[in-house]
Amino acid sequence: MEKKRIRDFGIVPGRVKTGKRNAITDVPGVLVGHCTVNMEENHTGVTVIVPGPDNAFAHHYTAAAYVHNGFGKSAGLVQVEELGILETPIALTNTLNVGKVWDALVDIVIEQCQHDGLEPMSINPVVGECNDCRINQIQKRAVGEKEVRQAFAAAAEEFEEGDVGAGTGTICYGMKGGIGSASRVICIGEKEYTIGVLV
């Protein structure tokens, strides 16, 4: 069954023009990849957002962080707030897998840096989380380095939304949640800018 987006039902939110895909990947260079874990009691996963074509550690993409729900267990946001840069791709997973995904990001970034002739002495992985314990047996911590690498390998401009990756076990206001994305194109003076989001 093909997954539908809200616009497929004739509902058009907002008045601002969308990008080509109406997704975060309308921002040039941004890629998204998922690895979904569906086995026995585990329904979870990991989603990675690659911020651009260059090695993030070497390029230092401009970034900011805003905490809407102070109950989260995210990693890496303090340095983003302090320095205003992103040194790694962003990963999203379930609450109890933040540490394992953080570890995998460190390994992946070290490999990328060594390939580019860099020797990082400190890396600030950014990992966001959502507690998916109502659908997923969260204590089994089913997401590890293998799944993070699979999500990286799947990273592309076209990506699935809904019940995939980090959205696999999510619930939102008592309903099944998932991954969603959108983009808008705005004009400032004569120049167009694309804003993309992934939730």
Mark where each language-model region is.
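Alpha/propeptide regions of enzymes that mature by internal proteolysis
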Residues: 1-199
